[in-house]
UniProtKB/Swiss-Prot annotation:
The lineage of its organism: Eukaryota, Viridiplantae, Streptophyta, Embryophyta, Tracheophyta. In the N-terminal section; belongs to the aldolase class II family. MtnB subfamily. In the C-terminal section; belongs to the HAD-like hydrolase superfamily. MasA/MtnC family. InterPro entries: Aldolase_II/adducin_N (IPR001303), Aldolase_II/adducin_N_sf (IPR036409), Enolase-ppase_E1 (IPR023943), ENOPH1_eukaryotes (IPR027511), HAD-like_sf (IPR036412), HAD_sf (IPR023214), MethylthioRu-1-P_deHdtase_MtnB (IPR017714), MtnB_viridiplantae (IPR027505). It holds the Pfam family Aldolase_II. The keyword Metal-binding applies. One of its GO terms (molecular function) is methylthioribulose 1-phosphate dehydratase activity. It comes from the Eukaryota. This is Probable bifunctional methylthioribulose-1-phosphate dehydratase/enolase-phosphatase E1. It catalyses: 5-(methylsulfanyl)-D-ribulose 1-phosphate = 5-methylsulfanyl-2,3-dioxopentyl phosphate + H2O; 5-methylsulfanyl-2,3-dioxopentyl phosphate + H2O = 1,2-dihydroxy-5-(methylsulfanyl)pent-1-en-3-one + phosphate. Its cofactor is Zn(2+); Mg(2+). One of its GO terms (cellular component) is cytoplasm. Pathway: Amino-acid biosynthesis; L-methionine biosynthesis via salvage pathway; L-methionine from S-methyl-5-thio-alpha-D-ribose 1-phosphate: step 2/6; Amino-acid biosynthesis; L-methionine biosynthesis via salvage pathway; L-methionine from S-methyl-5-thio-alpha-D-ribose 1-phosphate: step 3/6; Amino-acid biosynthesis; L-methionine biosynthesis via salvage pathway; L-methionine from S-methyl-5-thio-alpha-D-ribose 1-phosphate: step 4/6. Residues 279-518 are annotated as: Enolase-phosphatase E1.
Length: 518
């Protein structure tokens, strides 16, 4: 083992970091064993094609029960070294802030001078943001190719595969979602994109880099390695399913739908049926994953209520939002709604009013209430998020092509969601596929009526001016909404997407797993 040199910061830090780790810890059995482990894993990963051509890397924390995990030393494989020839003494030892505490000794020609992994800043993000115990960076071919199948996709999705059970927090029936970030010329330039993906996808344990590879982390080296094996298996399965024309992202893994329609729609008997004059789409579970709303939009609104109200308190828009909330809360208090607390008058002062508003809004969001006062405020908060590039709408990969096709056929497409019309426009105005509003003719929200009431769909059909309600096709993932729309005479299909609620047996509705089936 080379003597510990002066601390050199990879990602901030300095001499003070060197004092964190005693010489005894640096020379401990935990550190020595981790050096050996990384060398062994590099050899194994080389045979799997994950770290060929000196690419890829691995980092593991030196576990010591007497030291809190966040303070444990970090060991990393070096950059530009043949991974199958790695030796224990080749590893770098870093403090938690990225300062190098121990470097490998230079080797004679033809070896290059030692250099810490270019992945170090990205590894440190996973350690800091997820309290990881180990991180693997793989250049496995399957992790590269799977990002190329759809070069516009921002996510990899797969469901109903046994190996999903090997991914932390997932089961067989779950939809596994892995974010995809764009590659850059230099590894460290990926740091911000990786951090944003980790923040935006709180359930993920991996981030794909298009045309490059994948970063995978776990609580321990065993967890990271196990998940890495499962991820690579699933990517390989998706590629092979794609090659034989099967869709890996749907529960039944049926044929990939790529229907080209010109004069009508093919039904199950391959007869051409007249096209609908209008299509009305739900959002959650239909155009957009439920997880986007639950894991991204709702938390963003919840976490930014106070900031938004403080910054805009004196504007006419926010005064209107507050008045709506006051009215709603007064009604909630009268009805004994759980979580409702009185909102002081303006005389109590801005901070007192905002504190009460925040408490009520948080309770409403937690209860997933579909009320206008909440939806209107959320829309205004989300607007700021989109304007500041803190939010980006997400739609399923089959949605943009379908919208474009329907638009070309002269079919008018509308949105009907419990979210406000503003929130709807925001989602489709800035998506992972760009601005899709050019394909949409209008937006309906709960001001037209409750989505589970037939009267709402009668109102929509009268607003659209169709000759008969059956000229409208309504697509939703919710049985009660489908039932209400059918009662108004609309043609109805139910969207089956991973994570959607199960349907009653013998529900009697047509179902689709992709817009390509419409």
């Amino acid at each position: 083992m080379a003597a510990a040199p002066p601390a050199v910061a990879v990602n901030g830090g300095g001499m003070a970091a060197a004092k964190v780790a005693s010489q005894a810890y640096l020379e401990s059995k935990a550190v020595k064993d981790t050096r050996v482990l990384i060398a062994d894993l590099c050899k194994q990963f080389y045979t799997l094609g994950w770290v060929s051509g000196t690419g890829g890397s691995i980092t593991i924390k030196a576990h010591d029960d007497s030291i809190p995990k966040r303070q444990q030393l970090i060991l990393m494989s070096p950059s530009g070294v043949q991974k199958e020839r790695m030796e224990p003494e080749d590893m770098y030892v870093l403090a938690t802030n990225g300062s190098i505490l121990s470097s490998p000794s230079p080797k004679p020609y033809p070896y290059k001078p030692p250099k810490c992994s270019d992945c170090a800043p990205l590894f440190l993000k996973a350690y800091d943001m997820r309290n990881a115990g180990a991180v693997i960076h793989s250049h496995g071919m399957e992790s590269c190719l799977v990002t190329m199948i759809n070069p516009l996709s921002k996510e990899f999705r797969i469901t109903h595969m046994e190996m999903i059970k090997g991914i932390q927090g997932h089961g067989y029936y779950d939809e596994l979602v892995v974010p995809i970030i764009e590659n850059t010329a230099y590894e460290n330039e990926l740091t911000d994109s990786l951090a944003k993906a980790i923040e935006a996808y709180p359930k993920t344990t991996a981030v794909l880099v298009r045309n490059h590879g994948i970063y995978i982390w776990g609580d321990s080296w065993i967890s990271a390695k196990t998940q890495a094996e499962c991820y690579h298996y699933l990517f390989d399965a998706a590629i092979k399913l794609h090659q034989i024309g099967l869709d890996w992202s749907t529960p039944n893994h049926g044929p990939i739908q790529n229907v080209k329609v010109k004069a009508g729609m093919n039904n199950s008997n391959n007869r051409i049926e007249p096209l609908p004059r209008c299509i009305v789409l739900d959002i959650e579970g239909t155009t957009t994953p439920i997880t986007f709303v639950a894991d991204v939009l709702f938390p963003y609104a919840r976490d930014n209520v106070g900031r938004h109200l403080s910054a805009t308190y004196d504007t006419a828009e926010t005064k209107d939002d507050i008045n709506l909330l006051r009215t709603q809360v007064e009604d909630d208090l009268a009805q004994g709604v759980d979580g409702a607390i009185p909102i002081p008058t303006d005389d109590a002062g801005k901070e007192e009013v905002i504190a009460a508003l925040v408490a009520n809004v948080e309770a409403m969001i937690k209860a997933d209430r579909k009320i206008t006062a909440l939806k209107q405020l959320q829309g205004h908060i989300w607007r700021t998020g989109y304007e500041n590039n803190e939010l980006e709408g997400v739609v399923y990969d089959d949605v943009p092509e379908a919208l474009e096709k329907w638009h070309a056929l002269g079919i008018k497409v509308y949105i009907y969601s419990s979210g406000s019309r503003l929130a709807q426009r925001l989602i489709f105005g800035k998506t992972n596929y760009g601005d899709l509003r050019k394909y949409l003719s209008g937006f309906f929200d709960t001001t037209v009526g409750n989505k589970k009431e037939t009267r709402s769909y009668i109102e929509i059909s009268e607003s659209l001016g169709v000759d008969k309600p059956s000229d409208i096709l309504f697509v939703t993932d919710v049985f009660q909404e489908a039932f209400a729309a059918k009662g108004a005479g609309l043609d109805v299909m139910i969207s089956i997407r991973p994570g959607n609620a199960p349907l009653p047996e013998n529900h009697g509705f047509k179902t689709i797993t992709s817009f390509a089936e419409i």
